[in-house]
Structures are given as structure tokens and as C-alpha cells.
Amino acid sequence: RYDHPGDAIYAPLLLKQLSDRKPADCVVTTDVGQHQMWAAQHIAHTRPENFITSSGLGTMGFGLPAAVGAQVARPNDTVVCISGDGSFMMNVQELGTVKRKQLPLKIVLLDNQRLGMVRQWQQLFFQERYSETTLTDNPDFLMLASAFGIPGQHITRKDQVEAALDTMLNSEGPYLLHVSIDELENVWPLVPPGASNSEMLEKLS
């Protein structure tokens, strides 16, 4: 399930490694997209209120302000926001709130330089007619975080993951872990449009 060839970072495995390392009382928030699906599939929780997501509402940009609220409400618990490069840019200004309030929340930014879920649907259901899903002109996310006084790290290889997660979780203040992942990685299983849960696609045929 977590076997993946090559040196590239495999998002499901990274999130499983995060799940194994995070404190039992850790709160995880997500934005919307492939990272949201992977987080729901591969991060375990001890209580239902420890996973905060907008589910099927599709509210990109939800994850960071949700993490801010969770950290204010539970100042003694670890809060981790799982985001994607598309969603993160929707409410990136909330890094100002993180700095102003000195909130020690952590951000795992899974960056495939795509609107990944939209790209996957265009691949599977629209004959690979890709439109407005490429984000190769993303900003330098570490420089952006640094402008708000938030430290971070950028990783690109699977052998960097464990040490990077440990550094993030052990940091005293806010922290951004920028993770480059394969732009063509898909989420499985997937329910096609108009289908039922008994008609899930297990992989690309």
C-alpha cells in the first residue's frame, strides 16, 4: 500500500509517517483537494474532534484559518494543517494572524504545482483536456513564510521525510514544511461522477 518506486515523496506514506509521530491529542485540519482525501485515508485519530475538514463542501482555503481557531481553542495541543499549494494560496494572509498571535501551529504543504483534484478529474473523465490546473508559477513558499517570521523547510526526497517531520513537530513555534510531490499522483479509490459508493474506481484502468 505504501510501496512507491523512486526517490520522490509519496504523499500517502508521508501522512502515515506523520500519523505515527503526532501526539495522541493532535488536531489535524485540512484544506480541499487530493491532500484532503489522503489525510482522511492515512492519518489516524483518537477522537473525532481531532480531525477538522470541510468534507464535501469544497471550501478551498479552509485549513489554515481552521487551524488558527483550533490552536486558539486548544493552546496546549499540537495543531497541524495539511494543505495543498492551490488551497494554501486562498487564505495565505492568515499567516499574519499566526505571527501576530504567535500560534505554534504546523503546516504541511503538499505541493504538486497543480489543482490536483481538478486535474485528476480532467484526466479521468474529460479525456485529459487540462484547463486552468497548472500552478508552476507558485511563489517561493519558504520565503513567503519567512516574511511572516515563520521558519520552515523544503523537502523533495522520501529519505528526508522522517527527519523533517520530527523537526516540525518538535519546533516551539509555527513551522511550514514544504513538500514537493509528483504532479501526476492520483487519489484512490475514487467515486466517479453520478456513481454510487459500490462503483468506486480502485485505480486508473
Spans of model-derived segments:
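Short glycine/proline- and charge-enriched loop/turn segments
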Residues: 45-50, 121-129, 197-198
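Active-site diphosphate/adenylate-binding microenvironment
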Residues: 1-65, 70
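Conserved thiamine diphosphate
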Residues: 73-164
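Short acidic, glycine/serine/threonine-rich loops at helix termini
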Residues: 39-44, 63-65, 92-94, 117-122, ...
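Glycine/aspartate-rich loop-and-adjacent alpha/beta segment that forms the canonical ThDP
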Residues: 143, 158-205
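Short gly/pro/ser/thr-enriched loop/turn and capping motifs at secondary-structure boundaries
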Residues: 36-37, 58-60, 88-89, 113-117, ...
